[in-house]
Amino acid sequence: MSILPGIDSTPTTNELFEGTNEIHKLEIEKGYEWKVEVNAESKLVIEVKSGIAEIFGTELANDIEYSFYNNKFSILAVEDVSLEWRCPEIPEQKLMIGENKTAKYVYNLHFSLEKMRAASFDGPKVMIVGGSNTGKTALARTLCSYAIKYKSYQPMFINLNPEEGIFSVAGCLTATPISDILDVQSTIWGHSMTSGATMLHSKQPLVKTFGLEHIKENQDLYLATLKQLSEVVKLRLQNDVLVHRSGCIIDTPPISVMDDDLTELTTTFKEFNVNVVILLSDEQEDPLLTKLNDKLSTISSSFNLLRLPILSGVIERDDVFKRSLQRLAIREYFYGSPSVVLSPYTIGVDFEDITVWRPINFIENPEETSQLLPTQLLPVEVKPTTLQHALVAISYADRKANESNVQLAPTLGFGLITEVNDKRRKLRILLPVPGRLPDKAMILTAYRYLE
């Protein structure tokens, strides 16, 4: 019998979606972990019913729903855990659950750092080194979480990877005192100071704008930006006894993006007075360990160099996923997250009311920039081809300041240029708070965002 017009017994896509969004129960044995991958179009909801589970060192509260979007992480069972979850796109038969064989090394490292904090008012300065997908950032996040878990420490987390947006958008180097628990649902660890109400205590990062995506595009500028950040960190440590005693956790870029001499690491080691270096590698006699020891020993003899195995909970992240995180960081900066909704503000300004500079990219324009100083900023002509949909950093430097003052100035915030109208000589700029555009100089970053 044929189906009558307008009547179809086949369920729609929405019906199938709703039908599979059922609650699943899961038991995770102590010492095991669930590796979770959630794509951008999915939503995973988890509720721990009993036991102790943690994500990157932060414990999940029982009987509270946690929602995750576009994320990759592992849930570690500190005790036997019983939880409920729902997500139509994750097949129940294909859950990735396995034993965590590296948690004991992380615990031992944490307790060693605790002893250093207890023994001296000059806290440990830890530099974490490794390749891509070794768990560097996960280890840094876990150590920060453990440091504040039982004592009132406030470690300074320092992100030196411009491709990662942590408490900020990508393209920046940041230093953030961690004084409260980190948001396990957020890919950027939580919110910086915002105009909206947040579930958790917001953080106040110290931000320096590099402006480019890759270190190799202008290594000299990267090193100069790193040194400027280190000066700000030193000043904060001098004026804050608690942060000074808590120390610093430094997440470095992957080894693959550095030069053969490891200049980025040796500069970090020197500028931040590092005394603990952690190499994440599964090779017991990794030649990089010897190379690091030789390079760093020429700078200081008083440091500890340790090798830890690559973390068990690591989930590989490809370039497509990293791009999606960069876009998400920009979106969350202006619009917030599903749990913390923000209302950005669009203003109109004349071409003459803004001054924009840009960093030199030696990879894109080698012939144009061969005679210029690497740390020099170049003026940007206001036109659609250069500024449409561009993310700009608003500096503390006055709009009419010279380029050297702009380059040295800290970052006030970010704006998104949504429209450039040549005929009317007007721009529309999205800002995170209402009010007039600050009369400050801007730095054009390498990132674009199209709504």
Swiss-Prot record:
The keyword ATP-binding applies. InterPro entries: Clp1 (IPR028606), Clp1/Grc3 (IPR045116), Clp1_C (IPR010655), Clp1_C_sf (IPR038238), Clp1_N (IPR032324), Clp1_N_sf (IPR038239), CLP1_P (IPR032319), P-loop_NTPase (IPR027417). Keywords: ATP-binding, mRNA processing, Nucleotide-binding, Nucleus. It holds the Pfam family Clp1. Belongs to the Clp1 family. Clp1 subfamily. Component of a pre-mRNA cleavage factor complex. Interacts directly with PCF11. This is mRNA cleavage and polyadenylation factor CLP1.
